[in-house]
Amino acid sequence: SIDFGGESGSVDQAALFSDAQVVARHTGERFDFESRATVGYTWDMSGGDDNPDNETRIYDLYMDLNDQSLGVSTRLGRQTLRNQGVLGRFDGGIVSWQVAPSYRLNVLAGLPVYNPNETVETSRTFYGFSVDALNLLDLIDVNVFMNIQEVDDVNDREAAGAEIRYFGGNRALIASVDYDFGYSELNSVAALGDRTFANSLTVKGRFDWRNAPYLTPENALTG
């Protein structure tokens, strides 16, 4: 029960929650293929409404094709990404081209998805690109990105940034920065590192500063 200023009430719920994941993979001489579906369903069993609150959730639903001969890979569908300037789940695609053993170009575009029970929402769009420099000096991976997001044809986010990963045997460091050049504001700076000493003692450190939520007109309108 819930008490509001001396008045109490109760909320009852009877529902069945279920989630499932299906993955299909194929590895060939030239092409590698993967498809993944992660979905959920809520069955409202309260029986007190002619229109029950049944809910379908689609967390991931995508296909991934990699051409080893050309060094090109493509992923299409609903997917989740938290780098390259992408802030989470979206409906869209990523195309990556391994232009050299240590360098990869990525182009991506899509429709941001804020809740897995959403259908395709066309009022929000984003597009961007990034460059990966891999295994530099056998120690460092670097990703540099630019990402533009629009809501109802209004610029919502104009971001550029980078992520650096360093692995040096007994030490590691991951650092990232996200800067919105539309607002001339820093959105986030984060770093995570650890060091293991000869006596097996491990020291870890973390720094995380960010705007919460990120500066966007849509976030401002929703409070």
Regions found by a protein language model. Give the residues of each.
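Gram-negative and organellar
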Residues: 1-223
